[in-house]
Amino acid sequence: MEYLYGTFSDSQIADFKEKLHKKLFWLLLYKDPKTAQNYKSVDFAKYFENLMKEIDGLNELLCYPVPIIEICCKLQAAYIESCTEQFDYQVYRKFVLDAHNLVDKIGEEDVV
């Protein structure tokens, strides 16, 4: 896959996608009513901000592919939901899982 400074191999892209999937999964654990108690010491807002900055860096490196726009939109919607007084974990979860599914579209040439 072409990027700003050259080319990433298919295995590099696959490895990165796997790591990004794992980072997105943590977003679920941090807010899941069944597991959130285990992560009280985690600064969720900071984790989220750092993750978004990392995705923004990828966005620039890959010359702004469409799936990353969608990923960022879904994640921002999840974050907004997480900050509401009437936080609905299922709504939040749906946004995160939608973003999770879009990760696999990064690098697909036929994505428009």
Task: Enumerate the language-model features and the residues they cover.
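Amphipathic alpha-helical binding modules
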Residues: C72-V112
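Amphipathic alpha-helical interaction modules
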Residues: K22-C73
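Short terminal alpha-helical segments
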Residues: M1-V42, V96-K105
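Generic preference for well-ordered secondary structure
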Residues: L4, F8, I55, N59-L62, ...
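Short intrinsically disordered terminal tails
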Residues: M1, F48, E109-V112
